[in-house]
Design a protein with these regions (language model features):
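Nucleotide-sugar donor-binding/catalytic module of glycosyltransferases
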Residues: 1-163
């Protein structure tokens, strides 16, 4: 485990249309100590999403091509086995982060006894890229009992501290 490193876990299935935007949002992060592990989950798109990922020469971006479709959870688990970071962040291949997302989450996680940081989510029109709703509300505090009932936290808006 590398202290301070964020391992960004990105499952991809037929991701050619949006994965470039996803990667661009990571490249624009003000917090730059990250690795991005993208797992293509045996997409039936003749490698279109894989080709988009391969256009990026940044050594922090790693591509794993799964030969068996395991679903998004299975793809995340493949990436987790490769992750080297103190922090784990999930980001689906059709989601994007604002530029200061990682920086704000890591700053929050630097507080004593905090192991999970999460933020709100905003829907964006896939054609126009315009915001189509106000941000989904996020609870101020989530405890273990809340997580057992229903998880109010979006995976793509969550960072975990493994230390």
């Amino acid at each position: 485990m590398e202290k301070g490193l964020v391992s960004i876990i990105t499952p991809m299935y037929k991701g050619a249309e949006f994965v470039g935007d996803t990667i661009e949002s990571v490249l624009k992060q003000t917090y730059t100590n990250w690795e991005m592990i993208i797992v293509d989950d045996c997409s039936p798109d003749d490698g279109a999403g894989i080709n988009v990922v391969k256009r990026y020469a940044d050594p922090r971006i790693k591509l794993i091509e799964s030969k068996i479709n395991k679903g998004s959870s299975g793809a995340r688990n493949i990436a987790l086995k490769e992750a080297q970071g103190q922090y784990i962040a999930f980001l689906d291949s059709d989601d994007m982060w604002p530029e200061e997302y990682l920086e704000s989450q890591i700053l929050f996680l630097s507080n004593k006894d905090v192991v999970i940081a999460y933020g709100g989510v905003q829907r964006i029109d896939e054609n126009t890229k315009e915001k189509i709703s106000s941000p989904f509300p996020r609870p101020d505090r989530v405890d273990y009992k809340d997580l057992l009932k229903v998880c109010p936290i979006c995976p793509s808006a969550t960072v975990y501290d493994l230390s």
